[in-house]
Amino acid sequence: MSSESGKPIAKPIRKPGYTNPALKALGIPALRLPSRNWMIFWSVLTVSIGGIAYDKYKQRQILSHATDLVKPLAEESMEVDKVPRKITVFIAPPPNDYLESSLKVWRRYVKPVLYYAGLDYELVQEDRQGIIRTNVANRIRELRKEILASTDGQPVKEPNQTVAKPSGSSTSKISSLLPFNKIIQDPAEEDDSFDPEIGKKFKENFDWRNVIGIFYTMPKPKHIISEDALTKDPILSGGVICLGRGAYKEYIAGIHEGLLGPIEKTEKTGSTEPKMTGVVEANQIESKVSESGATELVDAEKETALEEAKVQDDLKVDEENSSEDSQKFLKPFISSDQYPDLQIASELQTPNGEFIRNPNTNIPLLINQPLLVIPIPNLIGFTTIPRRIHRFYQKRFYVEDVCSSVVNCVRQTRIRPFDIAKDIDLAKDEEKDWPQNWVKQGKEKNSEWTQELVCDPRITKHMFVYEKPPKEEPESDI
C-alpha cells in the first residue's frame, strides 16, 4: 500500500460568500446562495403564493371598480313614500353539492354591487329541485286568481287589520303591537293559550315604524309607491337574476307553467294523510290487555291513552311540515309537450296582446322584467383537480364577467329582446361541470335539470335579457 493511498481525500474548497466587517462583527455568517434543492423549493413556493395574491388583488380591484360605477345611483335623493327598484334573485345549488357554493358567488360578487347601488332585492333560494319553478308559477297563478275573483265581484283578500293603537305613553304603543292584551303569569297557561294563527297574523301586521324611527312620532305615509310602478316602459322596471343553469331552467319552466297552465291542478292526487300506524298498534295493545285481569286493564288503558295522545301530536307536526313543503314544491301542472296546445291566460293580457301590470302594485309581471343569468362553475371529483387549480388561479376573469353583468343590470345600459336561438343556451357551459353519474341518475328519474329546455315563442316574445357587455380595454369601464 503506497503512502499516497493512505492520505485522506481533500474536500472541495467552498467559495467565500459575501460578507461585511460590520455583519461579521455582529456574528452574522457570510451570505451564500442556497443549494439547488432549496432554490427549487423557494421558487415554487414564491410563484404559488404570488399567483394567489395577485389573483385576489385583481378580484378586489374589479369589485371595487364595479361598486364605484354604481355608487352615484345610491346618492340620488328619494322621497319617503317611495321604495327603490327591486331585483328578484333566484339561487339554486350546483348539482350534487350544497347551496353554500352558489351563495358564495351571491355574497361576494353580486350582493355588494346591488347594495352600493341602493337597490332592493328579493332572494329566493332552493334546496331541492322544483322550488323556484313552483315559486314563479304560484306568483302568476295567485295574480290570476285575484283578477278572476275581482271580475266576478268576489272579495279578493281580507285586508290586514291593524291593531288599534291607543294614544298615550310609549308602553301603550308597544303593547298595542303584542298579539295578546292580557299578561299571563302561569307559563303552562301561556303554552296552552298560544294560537299559531294569531302569531302569523301578528307577524304580518307588525311594523317596525310603529316602534322606532322617524315615524314613531310623525304620521306615516298612507301609500308606499315603488319606482317600478312609476316606470312607463316595463323593460326598465325591476329585473331578474338567476344564479345557476338549474335556476334558469326552473324560472323559464315556471313562467310557462303560470301563463299556460291551469290555476288549479286538474288531475287527482293521492291522499297525503299520514298512516295511522301508531293508533293501530295502540288498539292491538288494548285488545291484548283486555284478555288479562281487570287491574292490568286499567293500567293498560292509561298507557294506551298516553300513546294515542303522543301519536296525535306527532301527526299534527307531520301535517304541518307536509303542508309547508307542499307550498314550496308542487309537481308541474303541465309538461313542455303541451305548450303548443295551450292558450295564454287571457285575464293577464290586454286587447293588444301585451301583459297587464299587477293591479295591486302597478308593477310589471316577471315576464316583462329583463333577465340576467350568471353561471356557477363548480367542479367535483379527484380527476378534476388540475382544472380546479387552473380555475383557482384564473378566478379574476370570472369575477370580471359577473361584476360587469351585474353593473349592466343595475345601470340598464344593454337590454335586448329574448332570442330563443341563443338565449335558450344561457349558462349552458355550466352543464359540462355536472357530474356524469348525477346526470345519468337525473335522466333516469326524469329530473327537471337534465331535460331539454323548451320555450314557447308566444311567451318569449314578451321577454328581455341583459346583454353581456363586450370585452373592453383595461383602462375603460368594466
Curated annotation (Swiss-Prot):
It is a single-pass membrane protein. It comes from the Eukaryota. It is found in: Mitochondrion inner membrane. One of its GO terms (cellular component) is cytoplasm. One of its GO terms (biological process) is protein insertion into mitochondrial inner membrane. Belongs to the TIM54 family. Residues 1-32 are mitochondrial matrix. Keywords: Membrane, Mitochondrion, Mitochondrion inner membrane, Protein transport, Translocation, Transmembrane, Transmembrane helix, Transport. Pfam families: Tim54. Its main location: mitochondrion. Residues 50-478 are mitochondrial intermembrane. The keyword Transmembrane applies. This is Mitochondrial import inner membrane translocase subunit TIM54. Residues 152-171 are annotated as: Disordered. Component of the TIM22 complex, whose core is composed of TIM18, TIM22 and TIM54, associated with the peripheral proteins MRS5/TIM12 and the 70 kDa heterohexamer composed of TIM9 and TIM10 (or TIM8 and TIM13). The chain crosses the membrane at residues 33-49. Essential component of the TIM22 complex, a complex that mediates the import and insertion of multi-pass transmembrane proteins into the mitochondrial inner membrane. The TIM22 complex forms a twin-pore translocase that uses the membrane potential as external driving force. Its precise function within the TIM22 complex is unclear.
